[in-house]
Amino acid sequence: MNNLIMLVTNAVTLSEAAGGLFDFNATLPLQALQFILLTVLLTFIFYKPIGKLLEERETFISNNLAEASAKLLKADELCEQYETQLKEAKTGAQDVIAKAESEAKGIVAQEITQARADAASLIAQTNKELEAQKKLALQQLETQIDELSQLIKEKLLGKVVL
């Protein structure tokens, strides 16, 4: 272990003595080349697939948003159409109800007029019958009065003549 520590301290002292922290020898261009290769490899292996996935996701989201917007517009149109149809149906129903009410009122008025006419006719007929019965009763009474007065005369005259 002591040997390892010694080696590290010797390497540090040698690097400080040779050029300091940045040595411009063959390792610097090699490290730059490694960095460029790592960047290229990461670009092809990691960044491009992730970029492609992100692009696909963005396309998917934008397509879904466009589709949802189209469906929302269609739903709004259908809603307006159904509301219009509902208003028309309500108006039609109100017209039918108003027409039925007016027909019913007309029928009721006609029936009332007919009933009044029938009642007036019945009253007139009853009055005629009562008048006819009254005349008949008066004639019968007159006949009976005449008969009774004749009887009274005969009795009175018959007693007076005796």
From Swiss-Prot:
CDD domains: ATP-synt_Fo_b. It is found in: Plastid, Chloroplast thylakoid membrane. InterPro entries: ATP_synth_b, ATP_synth_B-like_membr_sf, ATP_synth_b/b'su_bac/chlpt, ATP_synth_F0_bsu_bac, ATP_synthase_B_chain. Its main location: plastid. Keywords: ATP synthesis, CF(0), Chloroplast, Hydrogen ion transport, Ion transport, Membrane, Plastid, Thylakoid, Transmembrane, Transmembrane helix, Transport. The chain crosses the membrane at residues 26-46. One of its GO terms (cellular component) is proton-transporting ATP synthase complex. One of its GO terms (molecular function) is proton-transporting ATPase activity, rotational mechanism. It holds the Pfam family ATP-synt_B. It is a single-pass membrane protein. It comes from the Eukaryota. In plastids the F-type ATPase is also known as CF(1)CF(0). F(1)F(0) ATP synthase produces ATP from ADP in the presence of a proton or sodium gradient. F-type ATPases consist of two structural domains, F(1) containing the extramembraneous catalytic core and F(0) containing the membrane proton channel, linked together by a central stalk and a peripheral stalk. During catalysis, ATP synthesis in the catalytic domain of F(1) is coupled via a rotary mechanism of the central stalk subunits to proton translocation. F-type ATPases have 2 components, F(1) - the catalytic core - and F(0) - the membrane proton channel. F(1) has five subunits: alpha(3), beta(3), gamma(1), delta(1), epsilon(1). F(0) has four main subunits: a(1), b(1), b'(1) and c(10-14). The alpha and beta chains form an alternating ring which encloses part of the gamma chain. F(1) is attached to F(0) by a central stalk formed by the gamma and epsilon chains, while a peripheral stalk is formed by the delta, b and b' chains. HAMAP family: ATP_synth_b_bprime, ATP_synth_bprime. Belongs to the ATPase B chain family. PANTHER family: ATP SYNTHASE SUBUNIT B', CHLOROPLASTIC. This is ATP synthase subunit b', chloroplastic.
